[in-house]
Amino acid sequence: MSHPEHSPLGKASAYKTQYDPSLLFPIPRQAKRDEIGLAAGSALPFFGIDLWNLYELSWLNLKGKPQVAIGTVIVPADSPNIVESKSFKLYLNTFNQTKVASSEALQQLIHHDLSEACGAPVQVRIVPQEEFARQKMGELAGLSLDRLDVETDVYQPTPGLLHADQDESPVEEVLVSHLLKSNCLVTGQPDWGSVQIRYVGAPINQEGLLKYLISFREHNEFHEQCVERIFMDIQRQCRPVKLAVYARYTRRGGLDINPFRTNFNTPWPDNLRNARQ
């Protein structure tokens, strides 16, 4: 089993410039799912994706001329593994001095290597330079929780802050906060994110929800794990009929990770780069 502390995170790394898929470091999802009460072998109470954007993607064509592109990768939430982000960056850097016949050949290589590491088929798209001008930006839609003037001193995840008024009629709401901050599981470096919560059910107390999201501020966990913890805590404490949680984290090392989890059929969220990304 690959443990996070054995990954390249927090260690001096040699930056190889020739293709080397062995640098990818998979980490099983199950250990962290055990912590939130999701037993191995049981059906997951959600489905979804981890959406990665690759902003520092470069290789050489067969004439030795550098090529640049943006990449997107979609990893299914039911894959047994995630890929540790620094190892992903180091892997992508190995293309910098590697000759590749075409962007299609590059896409196929990345698809093969990441699918092997994640233990499930992933989707890979290469956005060529000619399409850069068509890339859009946007913010998460929804009612801002950050408008609330809350007072708090709780900075570790506290599900007890969450509650819904089960005596009220069900509502359908989309709530957003830009105050999500957690820390890397291994290095403790800050991870900054925006989160969108879409639900149908008894009205969730918005002040309690905002305090709960703020409570991740000193919590050490990877992005994907934080989003699954948020999903499960809201589901258990507030019991919505439908729930979807989508977070967009700021980039590090040329990568950003945007996990999405839902328990109802809905289109995957738009991959719109936020202002902070």
Curated annotation (Swiss-Prot):
Binding site for substrate: V83, E84, S85, H223, E224
Active site as annotated: C184 (thioimide intermediate), D191 (proton donor)
Keyword NADP: yes
The entry's keywords: Cytoplasm, NADP, Oxidoreductase, Queuosine biosynthesis
Gene Ontology CC terms, in alphabetical order: cytoplasm
Record-listed E.C. numbers: 1.7.1.13
Location of this chain's protein in the cell: Cytoplasm
Molecular-function annotations in GO: preQ1 synthase activity
Reaction equation(s) it catalyzes: 7-aminomethyl-7-carbaguanine + 2 NADP(+) = 7-cyano-7-deazaguanine + 2 NADPH + 3 H(+)
Xref: Pfam families: QueF, QueF_N
Domain of life: Bacteria
Binding sites annotated in the UniProt record for NADPH: S85, K86, R252, G253
UniProt-listed HAMAP family: QueF_type2
Subunit details: Homodimer.
Function: Catalyzes the NADPH-dependent reduction of 7-cyano-7-deazaguanine (preQ0) to 7-aminomethyl-7-deazaguanine (preQ1).
Family: Belongs to the GTP cyclohydrolase I family. QueF type 2 subfamily.
Name this protein carries in UniProt: NADPH-dependent 7-cyano-7-deazaguanine reductase
Species, as recorded: Ralstonia nicotianae (strain ATCC BAA-1114 / GMI1000)
Lineage: Bacteria, Pseudomonadati, Pseudomonadota, Betaproteobacteria, Burkholderiales
Gene: queF
